[in-house]
């Protein structure tokens, strides 16, 4: 297969209006596709979010410090800030995943810790933004019918200071993001 034919195939099958929705290239890396659409207009998720300050695939470290031996590592889908300066952890899932709420909460705890340490300004994140000392917002974003049934139950047990917003998207989100509910 030549590079030209590969590019042609990608343009045909990795497209929002592709005829074959079951093609492996159409279905591959769905979460990254969703992430790219959210990055293109983060205000679709919430109008309060500042489109000038959204970071994809942010390393999330935990432990007694970012350089501590044995620190937990992860990668947040999106880290943003509201127009008022409040941090926002945005966890995306393109399909049903029982870990969505717990993963989001894990990243929320890490972001709060780094916020309290002053790490974001120290490392050049959110340049020119005065970050609020309030706890970060947590957004759990997925197609509306793709939230795992256990998500609501798990959310009842998270810390009371966590302001969590479930954002349900249209099922055909590849054609453009539309919010069908916010809870």
Show which residues each predicted segment covers:
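Charged, terminal alpha-helix-loop-beta segments
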Residues: 1-183
């Amino acid at each position: 297969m030549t590079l030209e034919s590969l590019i042609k195939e990608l343009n045909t099958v990795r497209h929002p209006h592709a005829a074959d929705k079951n093609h492996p290239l159409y279905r591959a890396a769905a979460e990254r596709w969703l992430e790219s659409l959210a990055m293109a207009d983060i205000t679709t998720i919430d109008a309060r979010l500042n489109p000038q300050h959204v970071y994809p695939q942010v390393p999330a470290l935990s432990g007694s410090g970012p350089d501590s031996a044995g620190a937990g590592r992860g990668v947040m889908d999106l880290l943003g800030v509201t127009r008022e300066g409040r941090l926002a952890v945005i966890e995306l899932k393109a399909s049903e995943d029982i870990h969505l709420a717990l993963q989001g909460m894990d990243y929320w705890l890490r972001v709060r810790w780094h916020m309290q340490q002053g790490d974001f300004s120290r490392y050049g994140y959110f340049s020119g933004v005065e970050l609020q000392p309030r706890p970060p917002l947590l957004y759990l974003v997925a197609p509306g019918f793709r939230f795992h049934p256990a998500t609501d139950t798990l959310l009842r047990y998270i810390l009371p200071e966590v302001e969590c917003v479930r954002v349900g998207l249209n099922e055909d989100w590849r054609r453009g993001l539309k919010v069908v509910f916010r809870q």
